[in-house]
């Protein structure tokens, strides 16, 4: 082994070997249990971020552990075509490089351009996945627009259409006026803005008056421009001010349209004026009110979100209607929406109908990619009827076929699924799965897998011209088929039979509706087991939190706080990090602030920590469902942990290579080896660690599994066991040394196997050196060795109790040395009043170890009632440990030192008490700051008690 641990020199070579040798593939023995995980497919346009690194570490740890248990494991990998994101990247690229738009290319040529770009640049994220050590089967890599998944997507669409679960309808969608497409709720970013609430007077028609004699009612709106499309005013049916007006009419200003007053609970008596203008074609709530009250829908906006030259009028079912005029006043025609807003407010003021304007805090929806305000827009789109699909999907979770970890996410799932809305699946893009629907010249629609199939099925003559629908499917539609589409469905393939359903889905809670719920619905509808029962896509949904920065803020390019996992693996200098964070910004004005913060936080850039340290940090922070505040100090700590494991392994190898470790002994001879108490203890401790580690993984508590490894390797194996072996290896008999060498190398080998799922690289690298020294190890890689399980035969509770007593004895001596400032190297005489024969036997059996590790010249067991000089004392269990102090310390100097410490500590206590007694400080300081001060105070108070006790002891000497 190299003297120092250098992850850069081992990681990529090892990964290449693993991949070339095919270790990531399922072993194919179908008599063994199968275990599969389907990776959430990252966007093909993307690069690895901390969220990916976090989830991929969790998945790889689970898959490596199950592979080591002998299961037939598949970690299915692939990428998503990411419709809107990919199309925008390529549109920006051709605009910057060629000054062209997609229309200059035309649809087919532009799509070819995207494929070309995908083949050139689409591999970034898969290269980065390899850097993380992801043991996915690369030979089975899939892409959501490859031939197989495209065929599966088409098949699902056609079948759902034939079952009347897909329809085309005119409904309200989130419309991006810049990108000219419908977008999902996930692509809408709601921003808090300061705005206004305009109060308009709407005149009552036909001489009607309100209860207090007014000939108008007042409506409040934040979007005056939409009043051109109003088709009603809603009041609460219980509102005494207006209930008599229900059924009466308003003469809508500017357009002079008669619209009804309807009673609807959407109108809140306590909010605003209690009267709500209803624009069903331009507001989601109004759309529902309109449906309930049979109000027509008037669309006044173009796809650019300008005012139309003439309105479109529809019934609540989306059919063209002549119930209202389509006329729009000439001055508004073609006007930009926000310009129209100002003009309408001005006209209301001219008409004497502007009651008042109030400041108002608003939440405004923006398209997260187009960056403009989204409009609710009435458009023709394709929809999935989700209610019939949702029913079995809810039952699967209720019945425990699918479990959520943590369980509280089930409630979020139920809340959404029990109020599920039809799903808009069409997008006005070019890149994606084109909808398999064709229209003839009369507008009649035909759905089929191909145009040939459509013609054949409907007996259409060659002269009948068919035009395919221009829209593509929502990316989430094909993603919903991921668990079964990747395994060869609609064919009943061996892969589908073996690896479906998958074991666990690791996902963020933010896509529980967009992806998780839809996968459950689609899979249960299309995939059946041999008995014809619906299959679930996965048995467990493991919900992770978000990875935030050290201050708890979400990582984003605009905040300049994004950390690239690869930079933590390889390191990055400060100037490159600044350039990375400040270059190509959508909001360049933020660059200065971001540069300042980056230089302050990372004065020397980021060191290379290696993949294993990053993985261990992510695992150690993975408490289920909670957001994680990233902490570079923990990353540094776990890099030190990797160093510790490396150095400990070198110590073991130096003491076992070219030595007799008893490997050639028979099982009977081995049972009679002269193992020390420490040897037997570390074997027992390892069994406990194996038991805990496996239990934590089974419960998806990777944080606790990582903690078990850390505790065992750092504290028990390195800090204690290796120290306890030194007296034996230096002074023991040949038989004792042979036994200790045997235990050193076998426990190290088992420890490497136990840690491998979390720390794949360092464990493989060390294991290759350890393997030749251990009897009975076959195979070329640690990846396919057995994951250690608890073996009761190797566990001895009495041994653990005895060694814990020995540790307590040594720790007590070390603490007394520190307390009384006695040099660690100074030999001491120790006396002990034993509580019972067991403790006396422990001393007798372990004198060599106790004397060696505690640096003792003599251990004297006192007889009952034996007089003792002035001593520093400590309890070990119920036995009393004493160090005679005469000649060990300068009493006067020590008392003077302690007096100084006491004075300093009292000063700190007084200062903090003054701070906490200051009402101004307590009122203004954040709760966390106050809590920290209280914690400091408690610490100083405890220190003072200890110092005063030491003063008493030394004064009595």
Swiss-Prot record:
Q: Per its UniProt record, what SUPFAM superfamilies does this chain match?
A: Anticodon-binding domain of a subclass of class I aminoacyl-tRNA synthetases, Nucleotidylyl transferase, tRNA-binding arm, ValRS/IleRS/LeuRS editing domain
Residues bound to ATP are 557
Q: Which Pfam families match?
A: Anticodon_1, tRNA-synt_1, Val_tRNA-synt_C
Which keywords describe this protein according to UniProt?
Aminoacyl-tRNA synthetase, ATP-binding, Coiled coil, Cytoplasm, Ligase, Nucleotide-binding, Protein biosynthesis
So what EC number does this one have?
6.1.1.9
Q: List the disulfide bonds.
A: none
The short motif 'KMSKS' region is annotated over: 554-558
Motif 'HIGH' region covers 42-52
Major enzyme class: ligase
User: Sorted alphabetically, which InterPro entries does this protein's record hold?
Assistant: aa-tRNA-synth_I_CS, aa-tRNA-synth_Ia, Anticodon_Ia_Val, M/V/L/I-tRNA-synth_anticd-bd, Rossmann-like_a/b/a_fold, tRNA-bd_arm, tRNAsynth_Ia_anticodon-bd, Val-tRNA_synth_C_sf
Q: Which GO terms describe its molecular function?
A: aminoacyl-tRNA deacylase activity; ATP binding; valine-tRNA ligase activity
This protein's superkingdom? Bacteria
Q: Name one GO biological process term.
A: valyl-tRNA aminoacylation
Q: What Gene Ontology cellular component terms go with this record?
A: cytosol
Known catalysed reaction(s)? tRNA(Val) + L-valine + ATP = L-valyl-tRNA(Val) + AMP + diphosphate
Tell me where it resides: Cytoplasm
Q: Which residues form a coiled coil?
A: 890-956
Family annotation (Gene3D superfamilies):
HUPs, Isoleucyl-tRNA Synthetase, Domain 1, Valyl-tRNA synthetase, C-terminal domain, Valyl/Leucyl/Isoleucyl-tRNA synthetase, editing domain
User: Any idea what job this protein has?
Assistant: Catalyzes the attachment of valine to tRNA(Val). As ValRS can inadvertently accommodate and process structurally similar amino acids such as threonine, to avoid such errors, it has a 'posttransfer' editing activity that hydrolyzes mischarged Thr-tRNA(Val) in a tRNA-dependent manner.
- State the domain notes: ValRS has two distinct active sites: one for aminoacylation and one for editing. The misactivated threonine is translocated from the active site to the editing site. The C-terminal coiled-coil domain is crucial for aminoacylation activity.
NCBIfam families, per the entry: PRK05729.1, valS
Looking up PANTHER family in the UniProt record yields: VALINE--TRNA LIGASE, CHLOROPLASTIC_MITOCHONDRIAL 2, VALYL-TRNA SYNTHETASES
Name under which the protein is recorded: Valine--tRNA ligase
Q: What is the lineage of its organism?
A: Bacteria, Pseudomonadati, Pseudomonadota, Gammaproteobacteria, Vibrionales
- Provide the gene name from the record: valS
């Amino acid at each position: 082994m190299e003297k120092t641990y250098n992850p850069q020199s081992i990681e990529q070579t090892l990964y290449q070997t693993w991949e070339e040798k095919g270790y990531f593939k399922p072993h194919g023995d179908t008599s063994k249990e199968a275990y599969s995980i389907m990776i959430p497919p990252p966007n093909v346009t993307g690069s690895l971020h901390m969220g990916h690194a976090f989830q991929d570490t969790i998945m790889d740890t689970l898959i490596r552990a199950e592979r080591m248990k002998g299961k037939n494991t598949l970690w299915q990998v692939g990428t998503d075509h990411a419709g809107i994101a990919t199309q925008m990247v390529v549109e920006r690229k051709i605009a910057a490089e060629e000054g062209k738009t997609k229309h200059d290319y035309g649809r087919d040529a532009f799509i070819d351009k995207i494929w070309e770009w995908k083949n050139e640049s689409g591999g970034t994220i898969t290269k980065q996945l390899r850097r993380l050590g992801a043991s996915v089967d690369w030979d089975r890599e899939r892409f959501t627009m490859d031939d197989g998944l495209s065929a599966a997507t088409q098949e699902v669409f056609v079948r759902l259409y034939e079952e009347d679960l897909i329809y085309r309808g005119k409904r309200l969608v989130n419309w991006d006026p810049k990108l000219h497409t419908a977008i999902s709720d996930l692509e809408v970013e709601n921003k808090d803005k300061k705005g206004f609430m305009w109060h308009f007077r709407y005149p009552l028609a036909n001489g009607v008056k309100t209860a207090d004699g007014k000939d108008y009612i007042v409506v409040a709106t934040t979007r005056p421009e939409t009043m051109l499309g109003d088709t009603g005013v809603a009041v609460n049916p219980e509102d005494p001010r207006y209930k008599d007006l229900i059924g009466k009419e308003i003469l809508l200003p500017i357009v002079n349209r008669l619209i009804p007053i309807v009673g609807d609970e959407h109108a809140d008596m306590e909010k605003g004026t209690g009267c709500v203008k209803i624009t069903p074609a331009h507001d989601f709530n109004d759309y529902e009110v309109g449906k309930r009250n049979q109000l027509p829908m008037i669309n006044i906006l173009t796809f650019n979100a300008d005012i139309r030259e003439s309105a479109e009028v529809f019934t609540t079912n989306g059919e063209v209607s002549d119930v209202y005029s389509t006329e729009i006043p000439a001055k508004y025609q073609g006007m930009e929406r926000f310009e129209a807003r100002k003009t309408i407010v001005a006209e209301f003021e001219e008409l004497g109908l502007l009651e008042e304007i109030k400041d108002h805090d608003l939440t405004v929806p923006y398209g997260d990619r187009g960056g403009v305000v989204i409009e609710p827009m009435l458009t023709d789109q394709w929809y999935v009827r989700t209610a019939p699909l949702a029913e079995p999907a809810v039952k699967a979770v209720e019945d425990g076929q699918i479990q959520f970890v943590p369980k509280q996410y089930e409630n979020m799932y139920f809340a959404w699924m029990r109020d599920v809305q039809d799903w808009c699946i069409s997008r006005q893009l070019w890149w994606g799965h084109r909808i398999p629907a064709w229209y003839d010249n009369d507008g009649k629609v035909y759905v089929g897998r191909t145009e040939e199939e459509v013609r054949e099925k409907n007996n259409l003559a060659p002269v009948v011209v068919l035009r395919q629908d221009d829209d593509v499917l929502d990316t989430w539609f094909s993603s919903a088929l991921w668990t079964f589409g990747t395994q060869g469905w609609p064919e009943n393939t061996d892969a589908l039979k073996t690896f479906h359903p998958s074991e666990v889905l690791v996902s963020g809670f933010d896509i529980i509706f967009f992806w998780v719920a839809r996968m459950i619905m689609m899979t249960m509808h299309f995939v059946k087991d041999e008995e014809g029962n619906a299959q679930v896509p996965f048995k467990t949904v493991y919900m992770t939190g978000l990875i935030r920065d050290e201050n708890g803020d979400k990582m984003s390019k605009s905040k300049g706080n994004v950390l690239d996992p690869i930079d933590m693996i390889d390191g990055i200098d400060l100037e490159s990090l600044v350039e990375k964070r400040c270059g190509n910004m959508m909001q360049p004005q933020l660059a200065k602030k971001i540069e300042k913060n980056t230089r302050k936080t990372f004065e020397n850039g980021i060191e290379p920590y290696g993949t294993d340290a990053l993985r261990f940090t992510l695992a150690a922070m993975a408490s289920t469902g909670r957001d994680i505040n990233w902490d570079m100090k923990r990353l540094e700590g776990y890099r030190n942990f990797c160093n510790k494991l490396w150095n400990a392994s070198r110590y073991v190898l130096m003491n076992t290579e070219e030595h007799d470790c008893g490997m050639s002994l028979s099982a009977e001879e081995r049972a009679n080896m002269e193992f020390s108490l420490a040897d037997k203890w570390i074997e027992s401790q390892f069994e406990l660690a194996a038991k805990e580690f496996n239990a934590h993984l089974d419960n998806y508590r990777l944080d606790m599994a990582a903690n078990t490894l850390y505790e065992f390797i750092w504290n028990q194996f390195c800090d204690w066991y290796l120290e306890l072996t030194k007296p034996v290896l230096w002074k023991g008999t040949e038989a004792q040394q042979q036994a200790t060498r045997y235990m050193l190398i076998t426990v190290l080998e088992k420890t490497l196997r136990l840690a491998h799922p979390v720390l794949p690289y360092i464990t493989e690298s060390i294991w290759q050196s350890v393997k030749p020294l251990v009897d009975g190890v076959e195979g070329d890689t640690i990846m396919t060795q057995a994951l250690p399980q608890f073996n009761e035969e190797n566990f001895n509770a009495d041994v653990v109790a005895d060694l814990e007593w020995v540790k307590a004895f040594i720790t007590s001596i070390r603490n007394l040395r520190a307390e009384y400032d006695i040099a660690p190297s100074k030999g001491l005489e120790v006396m002990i009043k034993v509580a019972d024969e067991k403790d006396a036997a422990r001393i007798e059996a372990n004198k060599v170890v106790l004397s060696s590790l505690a640096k003792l010249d003599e251990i004297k067991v006192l007889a009952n009632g034996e007089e003792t000089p002035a001593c520093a004392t400590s309890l070990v269990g119920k036995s009393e440990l004493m160090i005679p102090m005469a000649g060990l310390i300068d009493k006067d100097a020590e008392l003077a030192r302690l007096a100084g410490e006491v004075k300093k500590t009292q000063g700190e206590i007084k200062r903090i008490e003054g701070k906490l007694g200051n009402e101004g400080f307590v009122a203004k300081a954040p709760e966390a700051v106050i809590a920290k001060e209280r914690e400091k105070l408690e610490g100083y108070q405890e220190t003072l008690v200890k110092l005063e006790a030491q003063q008493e002891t030394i004064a009595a000497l």
